[in-house]
């Protein structure tokens, strides 16, 4: 059992020769980073060592896991037939008159979903259909997925009817090249190289930071960035303060460079929970960070709470006091993006130190207990996240002011 040998013999120290040998062989692949790769390190450095250095892969089964389901959902929602249906339907309704329930019943959403699912060559859809056909409960599973997609499309019809932001760029890849004190990215439309100078030089080699942005919606010169999630997810000021990576703030930086935009052009960066049964359309409003400058100037400022978990005052002239940690001015968003970028590059510095000890985390004093538990949890597919020793002293509005330097 090689895992037992890893636990018993590995002393959590890598010699300089071993590190250099590893980099000489693996550097092309190792120097390509993503949000998930950095997240492995921040939540548990030993997990990063096992998964990203030793290359021990997770056990996989032929089953409908959350990854496959997520790809299936993305493929259906990004199909041109679905996007066009959302825009056509959203253009026909008066949101002040029609109820959420009427949106589902008024439009033949299921017909569009069936057409896209059964007339599609996308491997993300075909693979799921093939697995479903092998399961005894395949009809129930498929009908459940169709029902969920029906709700998800109804959510987007309401969103479009209110905001008029159109899903335009779907599942777009980005690559940020970091070399010395400069970040480079090719603009999507012109293919020109866009550069951004770092505030300081970090002790890391040249790397590429890559990823996919699920969805970018467009209204005139403004964009809104949306990332689909299988469960309820929101932005955390506490995580940002602890030095962790924020997915949506990383996407904000990527979009600024990929589309040659400024923060003043971005309505917000949000998470959209993939619809489940038993909830209402309102449960799937956007969560994340809104640009208060654009929201308060928009035609839907009074109806903001209908499309996102962010409230404005009655006349839509200010952000509700209880929600000020969810909305920021363009300049304040710049500060958050810079803070997140510093977090990312600092984590990369730690990774390239090749020190995967767990001294910064709350762990048992027993020798290698946390490392053993990490292996067991990793093998069983359960959560491997550790709790940092450092705690955030401030909360809510006070933490907001601290991070923004106010």
Model-based region annotation:
Residues 2-406:
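RecB-family 4Fe-4S metal-dependent nuclease core
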